[in-house]
Amino acid sequence: MFLMKEIPCKAKEIGYFPLFTDEYPSVLLRTVHSVINRTPDNLLREVVLVDDFSQHENLGFPLIEHLRRFGKKVRLLRAHTRLGLIRAKLAGAKYARGDVVVFLDSHCEANEGWLEPLLQRIKKQRSAVVCPVIDIISDQTMEYQIGGAGGIGTFWWSLHYSMSEIPEREKKRRKNPEVDPLLTPTMAGGLFAVNREYFFEVGGYDPGMDIWGGENLEISFRVWMCGGTLEIIPCSHVGHIYRNGHPYNMTGPGNNKDVHGTNSKRLAEVWMDDYKRLFYVHRMGLKNVDVGDLSERILLRKRLNCKSFKWFLDNIIPEKFVPDEDVKAYGLVQNLNGKLCLDTLQRLENKGIVNLGVWECQIEGSSSQVVIFFNGPTVEILK
């Protein structure tokens, strides 16, 4: 049982902003109804649905008619051109009137008592960016499956989001794991709450990023490096439908088919200092790609007096393996009688353990890079 302290209602009115693009109407309305039905009325100032240029006919007039039942509590904003998830989220947050903004994907279900633990933590620490425990909703049966805070958010050097087990240091720090916030280096990015003023003070989202991808790691690194914290709150649960792929067009301006890559380069150039070299090991094709003006984000980092990325690695995620540091060897494993090297054959690093093959050596290619290090009396090879 979770016992909540009283939260002054006027001090913590929230605005909730589900962003959607051609979402299934029943799934979208499940999200909206669950938030309204399971949130104390004095805490929920508004629900603002941000429609990022949907084309589904049932998200037109039928949606407007359905939302009338909520009166002024629910508003609908429509973009007349495609903004993309990142800029649409920024637009919603700027439109907000509540003290706290809550971002939940449009395919969620808020559980009982989901909001109060998030607000309580923000009330205690204004610079805390807080996430609920994300439960699974089956994309086949729509069944809600309750879970727990069993891991933390991390990242691959290719700048894809990943998760890992809770480290021992964090287990020791938390006296009551059923209640105490879980510090997490990164977040998935679809479900979190933040003080609205703090969100913009620390830089909001990078408006130079297109559509989707990379924004979750960018805000994660930035919050930690600039004095905030990123936390998972065990008492707060929200269900989420994990979908296979994206149901909408992911092509960016100029027919850019790799918005995740170009967004990640913006992140690497501004926030990762010399460690951006490890990103380019995986994405060497992006080295000479123009990703727009970075001057405003660089000035933001200077203005906030943010710490270095090495500080982030040493203090927030010390378990993170740095491939070219503290190892016995780093480079290619080549057959001396030929030009073949050990290679992952383009199997992605974020898919777990992969079987190695051989391929023509690629001096700058991530798939041919091998790390050798000692583990007790044995020698291990890590791709």
Task: Please annotate each region the language model reported.
Residues 80-96:
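Glycine-rich, basic loop-to-helix element that forms the pyrophosphate-binding segment
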Residues 117-118, 186, 190-192, 197-203, ...:
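A short, conserved alpha-helix in the catalytic core of glycosyltransferases
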Residues 101:
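Short aromatic/hydrophobic "clamp" motif used to bind/position activated sugar donors
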Residues 36-78:
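Acidic donor-binding segment of Leloir-type glycosyltransferases
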Residues 1-37:
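N-proximal low-complexity "stem/linker" segments adjacent to membrane-targeting elements
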Residues 319-383:
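Lectin-like carbohydrate-binding module/patch detector with strong preference for beta-trefoil
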Residues 86, 160-193:
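A recurrent flexible, glycine/aromatic-enriched loop bordering the glycosyltransferase active site
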Residues 109, 113-165, 229:
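Conserved donor NDP-sugar-binding/catalytic core segment of glycosyltransferases
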